[in-house]
Amino acid sequence: MDDGGRHDTSIFSGRPSDLIGRQIAGYRIEREIGRGGMAVVYRAKDLRLDRTVALKLLAPELARNDTFRGRFTHESRVAAAIDHPNIVPVFEAGETDGVLYIAMRYVAGRDLRHLLDREGPLPVKVAARIAVQVASALDAAHDHGLVHRDVKPGNILVAQGTDSDHPEHVYLTDFGLTKKSLSLTGFTSVGQFVGTLDYVAPEQISGKPVDGRCDVYSLACVVYETMAGKPPFQRDDDMALLWAHQYDEPPPLTEKRPDIAAPVDDVLAKALAKSPDDRYDSCLAFVAALRVAATGAVETGHAPTQVDRRAVGAPEFSPPPDPPDWARPVFPG
C-alpha cells in the first residue's frame, strides 16, 4: 500500500522529486527515469523481493475510466504472459490509491533515441542488429494478439550485449499500455490521434482498424531513421507530417546514405506502403528482406557502437491529390 494512505492525486502533485523515498504498492521510489503525457516511470526497489524495477505510474484520470481499467488489466496480463528475450518483462500490474501502475524489469541501458542523438546515423550492420531484435519482439506480441501501435526509438532500449558478436541487447517496452486503450476511452484531445507523429502508420491517422502491419510501418520508419539520422518524412508542422504519411512517397534512403545498397530503397518502400495489404506480412519478414538487400552495402568504417552502461520495390498507388501549401516539404526538391 501507499505509505500514508494519501489520495491518488498526491502521487502526481508537486515536483517529481517529492516521490523519491516514498513507498507505493510495495515499491520504494528511487528516481525518475522517464515521463510522458499519461505516465511517469521511476526506478524503484521491490521491497518484497529485494530487486530493482522500473515502475510506471499512470495518470490518475485513467484509473477513473472503467473501460480503460478493464483494458489495462487485460493487456497487462497478456504482456506479462509473453516470455521473449527482447520484450521487457512485466512483473506486476495493479492499482493503489486510485493510481494504476506497472512494475517491469529495470533495464541497465539507454533508449535508441539517446543512442541516435549521440552517434547519429548508425552503420548498416548495427542498424540491422537492432532491427531484427525489435522485429522479433513485435512478431511475438502479434502472436499473442497485441499490437504495439507506438514503435519509436524512445520505446526501444539498448543494453550491453553478451560478447563482441552480440554487442547490443535490445528490449522493446511499453506493452502494458497499448495506445488502443487510450483511443477507446476518449483520452485523446481534439486534433490528436493515437501514436507518435514521425512513426505513425496511415491507417492509424485515418482511424481505420489496425493489425500488426501498422507496427511494420512504424518499425520501417525507425529503421530508416537509424540509417539516415532522421525519420523518412520531414515537415514544418504536424498536419503536413500527417499528410505525408498518408500520401507522399518516402525519399530514397540512398539519397542520404549512398554507401547503402540500392535494393534497400525498395525494401523500405514496401514496408512503408500506404496500404497495409502492400506491406510485409510480419516485422521479421521485413527485416529479413532488408538484410538480404543490404548485403551489397559498403560499410563506412564506423567504430562499433558503444552502448551506455549507465542506463540502457514500392507498390503502385493511384496518384494522391495535390497537397495544400501547409502540407508541402520543408525543403522541397
Q: PLM features: residue spans?
A:
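Activation-segment/catalytic-loop signature of the eukaryotic protein kinase fold
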Residues: 93
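Activation segment of protein kinases
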Residues: 12, 63-67, 159-209
